[in-house]
């Protein structure tokens, strides 16, 4: 008998993903084989499974919290917005098509059978499934074809816990309004509420909790405080939070350009965790003034974001910063932008466009998407701030639909091992001031990250740090801290009871 519980929210970014990861960690600590599941995820942060399938980063870090290898079945449908009106539809880890919102809404009913089959296959292998909804179940305009909130809860026949964010204000109205907009059979599935992100004396909430419980008949299972834990965020909404403003004084400042279609900003979590590094996401040219390194991150619409760089003045600012001797790095879409030319007949239909010209390279987009985990070795000789990283092993993953060919004056940055073959990747200039790669997750390689940060320290006349920060151990500690806080502030025994009362045979 498989047990399951689903976290749904009163809105986006209320903390569902993190609390789901915390439940995965708790059940893992308690000896239960646990898997996360989100039927449909809309995010530009994605990752690659060991078998080369693309899935949402949220379910990847939830799987890590549960002590298991990420499996694409944990996120069978991934939507990656390419513009305000279109998204790339990824089914079971592979690109299916591009659709606008109306077309996808009409298409969703066809996915129900596949989603349920995938869910049931997971349920046969695990003791507990922790499901996560998307946005809010009270989107009444989408109810009839829902496959991710109450529609998924109905398919899985599982109880629901509603998560509400008190930090944004109006928490009791959000709880009451969400429950009021549900149909009775949907409301009956909601067995508890968690109030999340509270700051202050919880005693001030007691009278409100009593009233909301009386009004709705749904118990509040706990009040989670605002936690100082370093865990991944699912989407770009999180870039507006204090966590990414980077005001704390540190020896090294790294400026990451916040592109309109930024993807995989989880690439920089390991950098942000370094004790001597401050990262800042920037959108204004003047914010580049104190940067020791500028990074152009991944993008889901490379040419559109390149046009934004020029229109906003950021392109000129990046080039001026580079002329002043500050290194500029690009990852995936950012790497493509650093080149001389981009030929795109696939993603944007804009044809041939000039890049920023910092790397003598030409990128041509293709229909087929490369999705693979890889081991790599940095080139044996690297210039400037990258010198200490020469020859180091690194790991990462590729998600791209283009091929970049180097021209005269560019050297290969690293060699990938793919299907038993050595494949060149990335580019670096002779002075090391421009460096690009397709490899996401590069900074999760501890020795590489410490080497390049020490290279930046040396440029400022600072003593290198001899101690290497272990990011994997750091993440494990964060999962344990989250689980400890949830055990302290949430009635976990009640959640066990809720699951046991509603467990279903698979």
Curated annotation (Swiss-Prot):
Coiled coil: none annotated. Residues 251-448 form the GATase cobBQ-type domain. Pathway: Cofactor biosynthesis; adenosylcobalamin biosynthesis. One of its GO terms (molecular function) is ABC-type vitamin B12 transporter activity. InterPro entries: Class_I_gatase-like, CobQ/CobB/MinD/ParA_Nub-bd_dom, CobQ_GATase1, CobQ_N, CobQ_synth, GATase_3, P-loop_NTPase. The active site is at 332 (nucleophile), 440. One of its GO terms (biological process) is cobalamin biosynthetic process. Pfam families: CbiA (PF01656), GATase_3 (PF07685). Keywords: Cobalamin biosynthesis, Glutamine amidotransferase. CDD domains: CobQ_N (cd05389), GATase1_CobQ (cd01750). Belongs to the CobB/CobQ family. CobQ subfamily. This is Cobyric acid synthase. The gene is cobQ.
